[in-house]
Amino acid sequence: INWKKIAEVGGKILSSL
């Protein structure tokens, strides 16, 4: 599991809300 990738994608999702 690539936690850095998950965090990056998660951050983009949160910033788009």
From Swiss-Prot:
Highest taxon of the lineage: Eukaryota
Compartment list: Secreted
Keywords of this entry: Amidation, Antibiotic, Antimicrobial, Immunity, Innate immunity, Secreted
Tissue: Expressed by the venom gland. This peptide is also found on female cuticle and nest paper. The venom could be the source of these peptides, which could be spread all over the cuticle by the frequent grooming movements of the female wasps.
Keyword Secreted carried by entry: yes
Gene Ontology terms describing biological process: defense response to bacterium; innate immune response
This protein's GO CC annotations: extracellular region
Leucine amide: modified positions: L17
Keyword set includes Ribonucleoprotein: no
Known function: Shows antimicrobial activity against the Gram-positive bacteria B.subtilis ATCC 6633 (MIC=2 ug/ml), and the Gram-negative bacteria E.coli JM109 (MIC=8 ug/ml).
Family: Belongs to the MCD family. Mastoparan subfamily.
Protein name: Dominulin-A
Native organism: Polistes dominula (European paper wasp)
Lineage, broadest ranks: Eukaryota, Metazoa, Ecdysozoa, Arthropoda, Hexapoda
